[in-house]
From Swiss-Prot:
UniProt name for this protein: ComG operon protein 5
Disulfide bond residue pairs: none
GO cellular component: cell surface; plasma membrane
PROSITE patterns: PROKAR_NTER_METHYL
Gene giving rise to this polypeptide: comGE
Modified residues (N-methylphenylalanine): F8
Protein location: Cell membrane; Cell surface
Length: 115
């Protein structure tokens, strides 16, 4: 406020408004993307855990190498086992991954089971 005026000048009002507008147009979308990436990372972590459990079950007992669909934390995961030469690929896909599945490979053996 200049020269003991009782209100704000137009320049002060416009600069404050433009500052708030700048903050809203830059920080809010970045915050939104950060939250979406956090949900994606959590979903991927759950997917890795399920793949690890399935691989561990296969290695220990020789069972569990079947493709299946699992629902966990309101997300649907599709786990698929594939043979590729002497390897078994375990791939998992979910809607949260934006159609990008990820896979882990293990050596396929008929004799290496704990039981």
């Amino acid at each position: 406020m200049w020269r003991e005026n009782k209100g704000f000048s137009t320049i002060e009002t416009m600069s404050a408004l433009s500052l708030w507008l700048f903050v809203l147009l830059t920080v809010v979308p970045l915050w939104d993307k950060l939250m979406a990436d956090e949900k994606m990372a959590e979903s991927r972590e759950i997917g890795y855990q399920m793949m690890n459990e399935s691989i561990s079950k296969y290695v220990m007992s020789g069972e569990g190498a079947a493709s299946k669909t699992i629902t966990k934390n309101n997300h649907i995961y599709a786990m698929k086992w594939e043979e590729e030469g002497e390897y078994q690929n375990v791939c998992i896909k979910a809607a949260a991954y934006k159609e990008k599945s990820f896979c882990l490979s293990i050596l396929q053996t008929e004799w290496l089971h704990a039981s």
